[in-house]
Amino acid sequence: LIYCAISAFGQTGPMQGLPGYDPLMQAYSGIMSVTGNEGDAPVRVSVSLIDMGSGMWATMGILAALREVERTGQGMTVGASLLETGVGWMTVFVASHRATGTLPRKRGSAMAMTAPYELFQASDGWVFIAAGNDRLFVQVCKALDLEHLPADERFATNAQRVQHRTVLHVLIEERTRTLTAQE
């Protein structure tokens, strides 16, 4: 027999047994503090990522337990908590804070460590551009007829692009605003 328990705060500790739901755990784990735009109120992620993630972790635990039951013949207990899932989703922010001492901040759709990696206004909507490395940045610039940008020392490497993110965003968006999102 395998018993699986999913709870808000876990099966042990001072908060065991307390109720909790996805939005509460998004707030409690810090996810809402980094979601949205700088200066705006905290924002809940609109999908129930903590509920769904906890279900996935529980499923993985059950599958691992099945292997162990097959091997030993002994039943097992598996647990997952909504809080642990939320904190798990925050690992990049926690690691960054521990490495730099800087608190994470809201960045809208942008990724802190990569640029461009965010939404841009098109003539008829929005387009997400994700140039995750220098090679992809060159390809994006070519596709947008902005071949001169990779030669600009401000944008030659990802670190430089991150440093000059605001200027880069303006330059790319000047172009994307002339194109449809499909283009």
Name what the model sees in each region.
Residues L1-V127, A131-G132:
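Active-site-adjacent "lid/gating" segments in soluble enzymes
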Residues A115-E183:
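Aromatic-enriched alpha-helical interface/lid elements that frame and gate functional surfaces
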